[in-house]
């Protein structure tokens, strides 16, 4: 990733690009200066020249170079912070294997072998890392940096849908011992059937007389979650979270400094609550994730699968069915109502 520029006026420039005496210059991995274009050219022209120069470097170099270029591109920066962080994590697994290889020499069978080996320890992570590989290759193929995407046609492992349903007793056990920030986030996630990232990014401007406006980060669906007494109480609890003197926060779920919680920062508080609940309630199994609270919300909703889909914001009922985990009680023979 590119570091901060000494001159803020140069912050728009691509990585490894600098102002020369008469032209913008690109520094190769070998620290050789490659002329891009004159200093009179537009920023867009500099980026085009940069991508061409890096593309030529990729062709004669490695998958590491291709991945570096993707991860400093505008396309990468347009991804959500969580996705960028995940991709950075996945790159740490795949680059030791493919990093020094010419990307055009990586074939589908190489991807398959990686998947099979990685799948021994985690099939889910193997799928995620293959998706990262495919994203890098697709990005490079669209720009002419590689000849093909070797991930195409390589099957992912079948993932078994999670079936864990959080009971009211288990939910209340964690809520009982949790810090207020965790309590507020739990309630909003459950009541609004919302993802953790959408809860942590909630801003004060999303609160209205009608309810809480949420634009789902994954599907892009926009909804206003209508007020109930319980949702109002959760919002009030969040707004009462402590702040340092003189500080105001733009975020509903905020730290004392006023800044939003990162995923890792909040998960640390979440783990603390779960551990405390397990100690206080040893007869319960506190093995659920924060994301399972969304599934609990969908499972506890009344109505048909289609009605639950409309409330959840999923694009199809198949997605909603994955989250609908409560075991249905059905009549036996002779017990049906007329």
Please annotate each region the language model reported.
Residues 206-209, 304-324:
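Short, polar N-cap/turn motifs at the start of nucleic acid-interacting alpha helices
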